[in-house]
């Protein structure tokens, strides 16, 4: 099973490399390919500019037919976004934790991470607890 998943990830490597241009970085666990960590740098000209957000990614055995789980790893106990909780929950339709378009097997981890980064483009300071 892990060999099949490894082949799928190999197809995604180019896209994962492209994420670096968007200040999104993914690092797979050397001992378990089903686990990874991601870092998203806050977008320029937003409240999150220069912020570093850490995420834990766990891929199911039936990936890509089901989405990975994504957990936010906060630096403190302050909620930074209406869709990103201090307890680690990320509300995103692709993850099945929010309304909207659902995950499909043609999607990959890039789809999720780009969607999370796009959440950070919201410039409405009233929605978040950062000054």
Q: Which residues make up each language-model segment?
A:
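UBC/E2-like fold recognition across ubiquitin and ubiquitin-like conjugation systems
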Residues: 1-52, 58-131
């Amino acid at each position: 099973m892990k060999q099949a998943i490894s082949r799928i990830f190999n197809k995604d490597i180019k896209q994962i490399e492209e994420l670096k241009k968007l200040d999104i970085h993914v690092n797979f666990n050397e001992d378990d390919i089903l686990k990874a960590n991601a870092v998203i740098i806050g977008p320029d000209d937003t409240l999150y500019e220069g912020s570093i957000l850490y995420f834990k990614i766990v891929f199911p055995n039936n990936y890509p037919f089901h989405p990975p789980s994504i957990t936010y790893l906060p630096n403190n106990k302050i909620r930074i976004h209406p869709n990103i909780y201090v307890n680690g929950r990320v509300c995103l339709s692709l993850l099945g934790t929010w309304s909207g378009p659902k995950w499909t097997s043609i999607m990959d981890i890039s789809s999720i991470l780009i969607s999370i980064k796009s959440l950070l483009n919201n410039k409405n300071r009233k929605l978040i607890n950062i000054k």
